Amino acid sequence: PGRAFFHSRQGGGHKEKKKKRSSIISRIILIICACVFVFAAVRLVSILLEYKKGNDIYDNIEGNVLDDTPVNITIGEDNQDVTIPFVYNHQALLDINPDGLGFLYVPSVDIRLPIAQTTDNDFYLTHTFDKTYNRNGCLFVDYRIKDGLNASHVIIYGHNMGSGAMFGTLARYKNSGFYQTEGNDVFYIYTEDVIREYKIFTVYITDPISDTFTFNFSNLSGLREYAKNVQAESLYNTGVDISNATQVVTFSTCTDDSKQRVIVSGTYVGESKLDNGTSSEASASASE
């Protein structure tokens, strides 16, 4: 009986120790999970605050560069009358940042953003137009492109932000129905003294390194061959004639998984001269 009593005591103590160890392990796991949750929450809040800061910066830039006064212009292939909902001030853009080349307006997705160019393709990946460090970055032209926004092929890079900022809404163009909605096939670029209209002729997905990123063509035949090739890559037939293309502007942004690039390209179709922020005469696209 004494031996049996002794063994019984030993078994009970062993179970209590096991329970205590299990309880300690559970607490440690709980603490680790809580720490991970807190870290993730802090990280998320930090990212959201940075998004907000970036959006606020661009709202301020827009307020300084654009005057919300509608302007009627005559522009495009058929010299159509178009109403632009603002007046652009190029000098105000340069006062913020001399790297500024112009201003992009895409009515279909309400993109209103400045375009910069500097001596590399890295700086504006992590800095806004006013050179503030921010993950929104800035739209920028490839530094190797000569003549900036006047080049025969202009490539403009921008982040695909989850918030929809920058080029975060370009993916809508993968849907042919969106493209075919009236007015969604054009975008505008302001330079120092003109507003130019472009018609989107191709939308496709490509690799980060591909023939898409070819520029500094020596003649128009090279540009037109390029335009023909990238139009063949389009996710759908836009029906746009690019046989007489004189300039192509390409938007490039990451896919959601960052492994590929969404490409939206437009061909120049006309421009309207600016006079103190208002338009005067228009000219149609040159053709040969």
Task: Identify the residue ranges that each predicted region occupies.
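N-terminal targeting leaders characterized by basic, low-complexity, disordered sequences
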Residues: 1-15
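N-terminal Sec-pathway targeting helices
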Residues: 17-34
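Intrinsically disordered, low-complexity segments
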Residues: 6, 20, 281-285
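Solvent-exposed, non-transmembrane regions of membrane-associated and secreted proteins
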Residues: 37-288
